[in-house]
Amino acid sequence: YPTRTERKILKDNKTEIANEIGKSAVLIEPGAGDIKKIAIFLSSLDKPKKYIPLDISEDYITKLSQGFKKKFPKLAITPKGYDFSKNNKLPFKIKSSENIIIFFPGSTLGNFEKKDAVKFLKMLKSKFKAKKIIIGVDLVKDIPTLISAYDDKKGITAKFNKNILQRINTELGGDINLNSYKHLAIYNKPKKRIEMRLKSKKNNNIKINGSKYLVKKNEEIHTENSHK
């Protein structure tokens, strides 16, 4: 539901969003991904000046932006490779006098611990000299709905969660059998967050970077949080 619901919110409120953003905006989207969400309200804006989508993969975001430029030919689009989580120097110049708007949808903020989320938001405001920030966050709701979103019947989230094991195999010389682990999505009520874990189905002897480890049967690897 998160992506579907967020798209609907943006569509239903695009006029109000445009009014809040104002005229001649410079839109910056950290972790832009497929850049589809900003397209929902972009045509409603009053003469936007520039759109800067940022992604950790510059090749990916550059290729994706080519089609975006055809859809919005009058808009200056400058894709850049940038890992916003590392707080590195920006790969472009910005002016504090400009109407800079940060667009950060997708409830990615929920992946941070609370103190880190506050720190991250302060960084966005200061580093990007943002006038306003549009953030997507997921709300607390009934537990079955939350669980089903992170343990979907199609197994999309499970595949995403297990991808970290595949990356260990590819990048760190691992020999992990992905089928030996079960994807879990658990709601931690006191901390108001979904916890994604990988549960070992049996005793697994694994190798990472030449070192050997034992992951015991039913032992859980805590991979990610999504705070609500």
Where are these regions (language model features)?
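Conserved beta-strand signature within the Rossmann-like core of class I S-adenosyl-L-methionine
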Residues: 126-142
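Conserved class I S-adenosyl-L-methionine
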Residues: 24-33
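Conserved SAM-binding loop of SAM-dependent methyltransferases across substrates and taxa
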Residues: 34-47
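Class I SAM-dependent methyltransferase Rossmann-like catalytic core
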Residues: 1-24
